[in-house]
């Protein structure tokens, strides 16, 4: 079984619970992120690793369009049930996005990077599909700088959640953005 298969299996089996949890978080996510992201209203947004659509649903009333991507069809179906007309759901891999260079004004990924075997490929894809002058927003777990503590944390997380791959320390995550010439705020 590949890591992607483990991710699909874990979230397919729990899609109903994930969707219920996601629905309860939409307002909180909206309240926390709108002041930070400050959408103007005319943006085309990509939400990578949307899960049951929490971020996509939170942003949808405040932007022109949201395209929400996930690897797990069961999660996309759950998101589709609550999605307004300006949200499009697409089954795709974060490391191989089916979009052209610079298609989006704002590209987001929330609580997804730690599930990826190759986070550097996903960050490169987020950067690739963001228009020049656009923004990339990533919200994920941050590991401590101590490598032994990271190993212990990841072992704990994998025992709790088999879809977990690894948590990156802040410096490593920033380094992935630096490699793609994106500034980190």
Where are these regions (language model features)?
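Conserved small/polar residues in nucleotide/adenosyl-binding loops
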Residues: 182-184
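Conserved class I S-adenosyl-L-methionine
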Residues: 1-40, 54-58, 75-78, 137-164
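Short alpha-helix
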Residues: 166-180
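Short catalytic micro-motifs in class I SAM-dependent methyltransferases
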Residues: 111-112
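A short glycine-rich, Lys/Arg-flanked "PGG" loop and its adjoining helix->strand segment in the class I
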Residues: 120-135
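Class I SAM-dependent methyltransferase SAM/SAH-binding core
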Residues: 46, 52-96
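A conserved beta-strand element that flanks and buttresses the S-adenosyl-L-methionine
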Residues: 108
């Amino acid at each position: 079984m590949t890591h992607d298969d483990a991710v699909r299996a874990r979230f397919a089996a729990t899609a109903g619970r994930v969707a219920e949890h996601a629905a309860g978080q939409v307002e909180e996510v909206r309240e926390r992120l709108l002041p930070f992201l400050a959408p103007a209203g005319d943006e085309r947004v990509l939400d990578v690793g949307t899960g049951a659509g929490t971020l996509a649903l939170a942003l949808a009333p405040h932007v022109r369009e949201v395209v929400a991507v996930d690897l797990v069809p069961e999660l996309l179906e759950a998101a589709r049930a609550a999605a307004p007309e300006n949200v499009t759901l697409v089954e795709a891999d974060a490391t191989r996005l089916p979009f052209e260079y610079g298609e989006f004004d704002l590209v987001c990924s929330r609580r997804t990077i730690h599930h990826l075997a190759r986070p550097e490929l996903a960050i490169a894809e987020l950067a690739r599909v963001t228009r020049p002058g656009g923004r990339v927003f990533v919200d994920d777990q941050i590991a401590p700088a101590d490598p032994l503590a990271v190993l212990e944390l990841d072992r704990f997380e994998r025992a709790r959640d088999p879809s977990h791959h690894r948590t990156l320390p802040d410096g490593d995550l920033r380094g992935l953005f630096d490699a793609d010439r994106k500034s980190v705020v």
